[in-house]
């Protein structure tokens, strides 16, 4: 007896902004789409979206937690340059709520949203991809079912991040792609502007002590702010860099909401 599988035109692994948006667009075009998203940490991200992208991707005002109208660039020599933002402002979003809204939009467009963890891809005799995954045990995604499931896909989109498990299985050399690791903390901001922090300004630091090869950021989110750094150097302490960054930006003593 031949085992039967659900067949999708496209299976998208990863329900972040790229995966969820692809699911929405493909579903609206009439494709049968499955969006597979797993439980996991919220990725470190400043959450900035330029006005042109807010319009192009129809992001509602209700998702914007702040509007930033300037950016400050701090050089290795401590020179700070303030620049106005083209288009008037950059919208700031909280990725925890923004990503979930994008997934719900994809589902409303007709995509089949499934909670679970991607395991592997195999091929049927006719070459069709078989996606193996482990469903979440409950809606809170706190654990996965012990039983693996399968579905067929005419195409697979690996939107599961820089260290994509899909890419590693399907694309030669994907495991050697360089990537930047990032770490951020969401903190409560002071009630008013301080000497180094302003609620309507993004700060970007290009300083070796904060990141030897990337940059550090302080992005306001209304009552909170994302304070983070990135680096490709595996021996570099991102947590210590964020601790230093909080001191520099007058955010050392405020409440830490999320790490």
Which stretches of residues belong to each language-model region?
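Beta1/beta-strand and adjacent pyrophosphate-binding region of the FAD-binding site
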Residues: 2-16
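Glycine-rich FAD pyrophosphate-binding loop
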Residues: 11, 24-45
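Cofactor-binding loop segments of dinucleotide-utilizing enzymes, especially the Rossmann-like FAD-
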Residues: 15, 38, 232
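N-terminal Rossmann-fold NAD(P) dinucleotide-binding loop
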Residues: 19-20
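Short amphipathic alpha-helical segments
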Residues: 23-25, 47-48, 168-171
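Predominantly flavin-linked oxidoreductase catalytic cores and closely associated redox partners
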Residues: 29, 105-255
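A conserved beta-strand/loop capping segment in the N-terminal third of enzymes
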Residues: 52-105, 115-116, 123
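Oxyanion-binding "anion nests"
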Residues: 258-259
């Amino acid at each position: 007896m031949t085992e039967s599988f659900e067949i999708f035109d496209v299976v998208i692994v990863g329900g972040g902004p790229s995966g969820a948006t692809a699911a929405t667009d493909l579903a609206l075009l009439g494709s049968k789409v499955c969006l597979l998203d797993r439980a996991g940490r919220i990725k470190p991200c400043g959450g900035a979206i330029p006005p042109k992208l807010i319009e192009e991707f129809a992001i509602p005002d209700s998702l914007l937690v702040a509007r930033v109208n300037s950016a400050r660039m701090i050089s290795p020599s401590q020179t700070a340059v303030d620049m106005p933002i083209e288009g008037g402002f950059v919208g700031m979003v909280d990725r925890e709520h923004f990503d979930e809204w994008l997934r719900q939009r994809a589902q409303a467009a007709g995509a089949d949203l499934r909670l679970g963890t991607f395991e592997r891809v195999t091929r049927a005799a006719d070459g069709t991809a078989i996606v193996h995954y482990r469903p979440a045990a409950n809606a809170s995604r706190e654990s996965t079912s012990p039983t693996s499931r399968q579905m067929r896909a005419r195409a697979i989109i690996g939107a599961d991040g820089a260290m994509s498990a899909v890419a590693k299985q399907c694309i030669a050399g994907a495991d050697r792609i360089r990537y930047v690791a990032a770490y951020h903390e969401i903190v409560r901001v002071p009630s008013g502007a301080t000497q180094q922090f302003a609620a309507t300004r993004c700060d970007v630091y290009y300083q070796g002590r904060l990141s030897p090869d990337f940059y550090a950021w302080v992005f306001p989110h209304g009552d909170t702010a994302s304070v983070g750094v990135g680096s490709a150097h595996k021996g570099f302490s991102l947590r210590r860099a964020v601790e230093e960054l909080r001191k520099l930006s007058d955010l050392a003593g405020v409440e830490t909401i999320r790490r």
